[in-house]
C-alpha cells in the first residue's frame, strides 16, 4: 500500500471535496443490471470477450464491438451523452480558465504519448504486423539486442489493424451494470451473492486501492469473485473483460456512502461549478498533470472523465455514443471580454424589465419547470426590492434551487450593504446577465406560495413585476433563531456560493468591539432557514436548476441594466 499512499490521498481529498456531486447509485446500477440480464445476448458477449483476447483485431471485430456497445447502451439508463462545453469568463475566473486549458493540453499530450502515436484519438498498438516487424528490424540494426515490440510480458502485442482509428474512441471502459451482469450470468452466480461480494470489495476500497492479494483473500469468503481476471489491465481492453479495476469500479457503486468518485453525476447546470471545485482541490492538495506517459493519476482521470461529456455519469455510465476526447468536448474561450460596468443610477431605480436573449429565456422556463409548484419553496434576496443583487429559490424536499445575481443600479448603497450584510463585490457582478431576476419572476407558476424569513421585501419585489398572485408566508424567526445552523450550513455548502468574498462587519452597539461575521448569501440563507424550521439539516443535496452559464451575459449582449 505504501506505493499508493500519495495517489490514494488524492482520491480521499477528491471524495471529500466533491461530495456534493456524488450520489447513492446502487439501486440505479442494479436496475440497469437486471435490464441487461433479461435482454442481453450473452453468447454475443462471449464472442466479444473472445475477440479482445486476439493478438490482431480487424475492422469486422471493431464492428462487432460497436454493435454490442449499442445494444448495451440502449438497455441502460445510466449513460453519458454528447455535449460540447464551452467555458467562458464568468462562472470561472480567467486564471482558472487558463489553468484548465493548460491541464487539458498537458493531458492531451500525455495520453497521445501513452497511446504511442503522434495523432490524438489513436490507441497504442495501431500498427500492422508488417510495421511491427519493420520496427523490430530497425532496432536490431541499431544494435538493440532481442528487440521486440513493447507489450504484454510474453512479448505479444495486441493490435487493431483497422482503417479508421477514430472509431475506437469511447468504445472501451467498464460499466458496473455490465460487469455485475457478466459476473452473474457467466459466473453462474446469484445476483445477490455478486452484490455481497462487491460490497465487501467496496468497503475495502474506502480505505485503500484493492490489489490482487486482497482479491485472493476476499475470494475465500466470496466465491463470486473467482471470475475476476488476474491479468493486469491494459489499454483498449473492452468493458466486457472482468478485470480487477472493473470489479473495483462496480464495488464502489455498491457503497451508498463514502462519497465515491465513481458515483459523480455531471449536469450542464453545474458543470462550471464542478470544474471550479476540482481546480480548488487540485491547488490545495498540490495535484498536477504528470508529463510521464502511463496510467492517469486520480486528478488526471477525473478531469478527463468530467470533460469528456459534461452530461451524465462520467465513471460508470455507457459512453459509447460520445464522440471525441475530453479536450475536444470541453474548450475554453478566453477571448470573451468582460462587459463594461454601467454607470449607477442615483438613488437606485426600478429593475429593468427588458427581456433577456431568447435562448436564455427558454432556459429559464425549463429551469422553473423543474420546480414543484405545490412543494415548500423558500425564497430570499440580497439588496433592496427595487435594486436586488442576488435571488435564491430553494425547494428542500428535492434540493432543487434557482440562484442568480444582478449588477446594482445604486453603487453607493451596494457598497454599504456589502460591508454590513452580503459581502458581494461589484467587480464580481459586472458580467451578471441583466434581466435574469425579472425573467424568473415573470415565469413563476400562477398562485405559487413561497416561504421567507421576512416577507415585506419579497412581496414588494413581486408587486413591482406585476405578480400579485404570488403568495409569501413569513416564518418570522428572530435574528438569532434564523442563523442557528449557520456554521454547519457554510461548512457543508460553501462551494455553492463563491461570490461572497468581501469582509462583513457586524453592526456594533455603542462601545462594543467591532467583529466580523459570515456574509449573507441568499441561497445558503434559505437552506439555513429551512434547517431552523425543521430542526435539522437535510441530507438532500442541493441541485442547481439554472445552468451557471445562463447567469452571465454573452460577449454580444448589449442590454443595459
Curated annotation (Swiss-Prot):
The N-terminal region is important for the cap-binding activity while the C-terminal region contains the 3'-5' exoribonuclease activity. A CCHE zinc binding site is present in the C-terminal region and may thus contribute to the substrate binding and/or the specificity of the exonuclease activity. Its EC number is 3.1.13.-. Zn(2+) binds at residues 390, 497, 500, 521. Belongs to the arenaviridae nucleocapsid protein family. The keyword Zinc applies. It is an enzyme of class 3 (hydrolase). This is Nucleoprotein.
